[in-house]
Amino acid sequence: MIIDGKALASDIEAEVRERVERLGFNPGLATILVGENPASQMYIRIKHAACERVGIRSENIVLPGDTDESTLIKTIQGLNKRGDVHAILLQLPLPGHLDPRKAMMAISPEKDADGFHPENMGALLLGAERLVPCTPRGIVYALEHLGVDIEGSEAVIVGHSNVVGKPLAAMLLNRNATVQVCHVYTRNLKEHTKDAEILVVAAGVPRLIKADMVRDGAYVFDVGINKVDGKTVGDVDFDAVKEKAAGITPVPGGVGPLTVAMLLSQTVTAAEMSLERQRS
């Protein structure tokens, strides 16, 4: 089975529209883009188009590529103070002279659309999933939507980034999976992946995972986005692995749409949290 990320994202968007209607106002998302990275510009356009579909107000703040750290942090602090901005997203990567960790920590935890703030990451490790990284949230949503029994399952994640691997491991542990986290330095990677019932690959290595590394009937989520001979491919050898997997996400059209849809969901969550604070 091909796991259709676009179809699942459409379901999430429908849920988000209903939540916006119940709120009674349009939540606000502010994105910050530093420089003119073409890929980042494309991702920003995709996110803002998605906001428009579900009734989220969005604005994009573009700063020059030579913006200094002080200016970036002041821009973030200004958005933190605005009542009409419920969620803030800092588009990565930043230019090399800027420290993404300092910038992320400047975002108010209550407005952290990406779920990268240490306070939100810490809450996740303690089992409280309020604002969490969007890609892991999308993967867990897909597993639950497909009726996969996460509890007690053998889950292997290839990739240990703060964006995908580490937070996803915490989310799966919160659901009582048995989780292994591997990476490109793991020795004998096949020995770890071949028994996985849930396999998530976010290593940034084109077609790293071959068919003989995958268990029959596994659910495989390919987070990789790589360019090979002018084509976009994932970290999984899709054509070979799809013959063995119970479900597999394609690249493109798999995890990417889920990630964007979860950004919308988290923006509404941030607005709901803001409303609760006002009422308490």
UniProtKB/Swiss-Prot annotation:
Gene: folD
Species in which this protein is naturally found: Methanothrix thermoacetophila (strain DSM 6194 / JCM 14653 / NBRC 101360 / PT)
Name of the featured protein: Bifunctional protein FolD
Binding, NADP(+): G159, H160, S161, I225
Pathway, per record: One-carbon metabolism; tetrahydrofolate interconversion
Keyword Ribonucleoprotein: no
Classification via Gene3D superfamilies: Leucine Dehydrogenase, chain A, domain 1, NAD(P)-binding Rossmann-like Domain
InterPro entries xrefs: Aminoacid_DH-like_N_sf, NAD(P)-bd_dom_sf, THF_DH/CycHdrlase, THF_DH/CycHdrlase_cat_dom, THF_DH/CycHdrlase_NAD-bd_dom
Family: Belongs to the tetrahydrofolate dehydrogenase/cyclohydrolase family.
